[in-house]
């Protein structure tokens, strides 16, 4: 599994519209082959900043399958207008993992 990480700085005052548009865009990405799930988190200290975490089967599932696929143009038209600046997207693989144990 690969984790896509993107910090999304949204134009202040556009957060509600962004979240609505993301709800629609989520349907596009979730139908993409190799998509495993996503989480969109809103920053508590900077309310116009979001952290997008997307789980993919591989980097290529994101960079080729989704970004070069038929849904990406619609994804872009829904979301890219909200970003200032445009986000840097990076991919991560697990180096170490732990979770809380239940007693």
Give the ranges of each region predicted by the language model.
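Short, surface-exposed ligand-recognition loops at beta-strand->loop->(often short) alpha-helix junctions
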Residues: 9-20
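Active-site-flanking beta-strand signature of metal-NTP-handling nucleotidyl enzymes
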Residues: 3-8
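Short hydrophobic/aromatic beta-strand micro-patches
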Residues: 9, 41, 53-55
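Glycine-rich beta-strand-turn "strand-cap" elements at beta-sheet edges
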Residues: 39-48, 76-103
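Conserved catalytic motifs of the protein kinase core domain
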Residues: 1, 48-49
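An amphipathic, aromatic/His-enriched active-site/gating alpha helix that lines ligand/cofactor pockets
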Residues: 27-36, 55-90
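Conserved GNAT-fold acetyl-CoA-binding loop/helix
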Residues: 19, 23, 69-70
